[in-house]
Amino acid sequence: MSAFRTLDDAGSLKGKRVLMRVDLNVPMESGRVTDATRIERVAPTIREVAEQGAKVILLAHFGRPKGKREPKDSLEPVVPALGAALGRDVAFAADCVGDAAAQAVAALKDGDVLLLENTRYHAGEEKNDAAFADALAANGDVYVNEAFSAAHRAHASTEGLAHRLPAYAGREMQAELDALTKGLESPQRPVIALVGGAKVSSKIDLLENLVAKVDMLVIGGGMANTFLHAQGKAVGKSLCEKDLAETATRILAAAEKAGCRIILPVDAVAASEFKARAPHETVPVDAVPDASMILDAGPRSVAEINAAIDGAKTLVWNGPLGAFELAPFDAATVATAKHAAARTKDGQLVSVAGGGDTVAALNHAGVGQDFTYVSTAGGAFLEWLEGKALPGVEALRAKG
């Protein structure tokens, strides 16, 4: 049994008004959706519920209008892309509460889909205001949360509603929760975590939580430089948070105490300037020239990481190993991603990855579809990895 209430627990939805929180915060240009990935991910759940004969009422935010009606943050331009993904007409209401919403909901027939205007047009959304949550709940009989990416926020449409109506996880939310549970809550061991990206400062909580939970932790990207510096190695002109040397030392000590093996780069690809195809050399990490900066992990480091992955049953990945957006400094990220993908396809590894740069890096390597699960959630994925309770998820926990 799942630890969370899902659509499988909801019974018949025929004739019910189903308020479904979705993530439609998609990139737009000149009033058109330029990347419909988020829409395509929630479309199957919307279709499933509509085909059961429910009246599907979609709630979403867009941008950061901060409680004011900003025309540039209207959800109306999303309607054509939503209709195209669903293969059906989608109605639109000019507000998410009040008469405009109530009238649009009253006009729905079984199987219809309605998108309500941006919840963040109301200050009560981000304050999780009780009266605003009541006003949203007035238009529904059942609540479905299909927006894991917003689950770390205790807002009226992500958390408040779940206490006012029978509440269930949608299919995409369910898949995300199942994947994260497999990744960290009850994983097959040994577990290896790969954490990259530029700064230690943004991932202190993450690193401290992971050393207590995983068997091996690979630290890569710019943040590895701070750890190398803490170990007394000169990193030249590399990005390095020297003021966090003490924090890095503390994390290394915590890992040793917890029996977590830390894997840092042993060699690096260094260049004197940060640009595509800049002249570069591969050097040991204790021989980085003063005028150079580390822009990627070297081949010996990649071999060590891949050997560690071979000895693991579960991989959790957040952040690239180098400046992957500039060739040839994408080599370590691409080689490691391809190796992890091959192990996953062979049934040897459960691989869970997430965070904006990570998704882009895996897609750049051409293996995004080969991982067990790739989360598009960003902040919510990070907070889960940090061991924090997510309000939108906690509200869906099965009682008993």
UniProtKB/Swiss-Prot annotation:
Where does the chain bind ATP?
Answer: 203, 325, 355-358
Its BP terms in the Gene Ontology are: gluconeogenesis; glycolytic process
Enumerate the residues binding substrate. Answer: 23-25, 38, 61-64, 120, 153
| Keywords attached to this entry | ATP-binding, Cytoplasm, Glycolysis, Kinase, Nucleotide-binding, Transferase
Where mainly located? cytoplasm
Under the heading PROSITE patterns, the entry gives: PGLYCERATE_KINASE
| EC class (word) | transferase
Keyword Nuclease assigned:
no
Gene Ontology cellular-component annotations: cytosol
Record's catalysed reaction(s): (2R)-3-phosphoglycerate + ATP = (2R)-3-phospho-glyceroyl phosphate + ADP
An example molecular function term from Gene Ontology annotations: phosphoglycerate kinase activity
Q: Which SUPFAM superfamilies match?
A: Phosphoglycerate kinase
HAMAP family attached to this UniProt entry: Phosphoglyc_kinase
The protein, known as: Phosphoglycerate kinase
Species in which this protein is naturally found: Methylobacterium radiotolerans (strain ATCC 27329 / DSM 1819 / JCM 2831 / NBRC 15690 / NCIMB 10815 / 0-1)
